[in-house]
């Protein structure tokens, strides 16, 4: 799932304002976490799919994060495995905060007809102003099977209060054959023990962007998802459940993802 990437998993667990670089500091300057994820999905005309991942996330200090992961996914007759590295660096400039981030996912798989290479890399910048407004610029490059191209994205987020964050974004293909023009919206609600999220996406999209590495007849997407995170202070972790519904030109997919993130080795505390 697109929102279950490593940095997104951490962001779903931490308070939304922290994830966007607002005026907040992690409880521990140096911290280590393990992120475990499993998912299952349905897809008409197939036996569905599923997958799992394990990741290590490390905060070198309050503003520097890095992580590595390995993931395996199956959908219909296709399967693929890849490793990931990611990192982010945040710096203050006057009253603004800027977070630079990058990620790379490299691996291989087989779709039943032939073996294929799996490569997705991305880099981006998030600027936060007035402790409330964030602007995101990102470019994501795809090279999977015969699909390739760049997908720049512009996103705007606004922190209405310490517990409510809204985000809208637009991504459009540049070069290659992605053929993607995607509009998205999301809301995050955070509480003392529970965090909630919900979002929608619609537009033209390549199945590869949805992590569907099989041939599908249509490219018109209507998507909605909801999720909840339960903070587990006594276990120094958090559990997230996300349910995602996708309608890709009449081909309906339902996916359920469970993430568990926990601290180890240091005395950091969940936000």
Language model feature labels by segment:
Residues 1-31, 264-271:
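Cleavable N-terminal export/targeting peptides
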Residues 21-76:
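Short glycine/proline- and aromatic-enriched beta-strand/turn motifs that initiate or cap beta-hairpins
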Residues 32-34, 60-68, 92-102, 130-137, ...:
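Repeated loop/turn-to-beta-strand initiation elements of outer-membrane beta-barrel proteins
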Residues 35-37, 55, 86-90, 124-126, ...:
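Outer-membrane beta-barrel architecture
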Residues 36-40, 68-72, 102-106, 123, ...:
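Transmembrane beta-barrel strands of outer-membrane/channel proteins
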Residues 41-50, 73-83, 106-119, 141-150, ...:
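Solvent-exposed loop/turn segments connecting transmembrane beta-strands
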Residues 182-244:
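Outer membrane beta-barrel transmembrane domains
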Residues 187-194, 226, 252-271:
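Outer-membrane beta-barrel "beta-signal"
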């Amino acid at each position: 799932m697109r929102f279950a990437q490593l940095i997104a998993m951490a962001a779903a667990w931490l308070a939304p304002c922290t994830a966007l670089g607002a005026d907040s500091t992690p409880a521990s300057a140096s911290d280590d976490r393990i992120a475990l994820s499993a998912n299952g999905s349905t897809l008409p005309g197939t036996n569905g799919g599923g997958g799992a991942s394990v990741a290590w996330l490390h905060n070198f200090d309050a503003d520097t994060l890095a992580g590595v992961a390995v993931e395996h996914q199956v959908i219909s007759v296709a399967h693929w495995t890849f490793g990931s590295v990611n990192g982010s660096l945040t710096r203050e400039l006057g009253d603004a905060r800027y977070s630079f981030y990058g990620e790379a996912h490299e691996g291989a798989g087989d779709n039943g007809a032939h073996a294929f290479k799996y490569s997705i890399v991305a880099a981006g910048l998030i600027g936060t102003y007035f402790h409330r407004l964030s602007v995101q610029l990102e470019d994501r490059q795809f090279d999977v099977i015969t699909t390739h191209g760049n997908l720049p994205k512009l996103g705007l987020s606004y922190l209405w209060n310490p517990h409510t964050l809204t985000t809208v974004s637009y991504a459009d293909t540049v070069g290659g054959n992605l053929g993607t023009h995607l509009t998205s919206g999301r809301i995050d609600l955070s509480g003392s023990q529970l965090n909630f999220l919900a979002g929608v996406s619609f537009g033209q999209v390549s199945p590869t962007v949805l992590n569907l590495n099989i041939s599908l007849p249509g490219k018109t997407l209507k998507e909605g998802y909801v999720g909840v995170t339960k903070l587990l202070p006594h276990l120094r972790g958090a559990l997230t459940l996300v349910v995602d519904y996708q309608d890709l030109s009449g081909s309906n997919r339902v996916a359920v993802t469970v993430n568990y993130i926990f601290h180890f080795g240091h005395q950091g505390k969940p936000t």
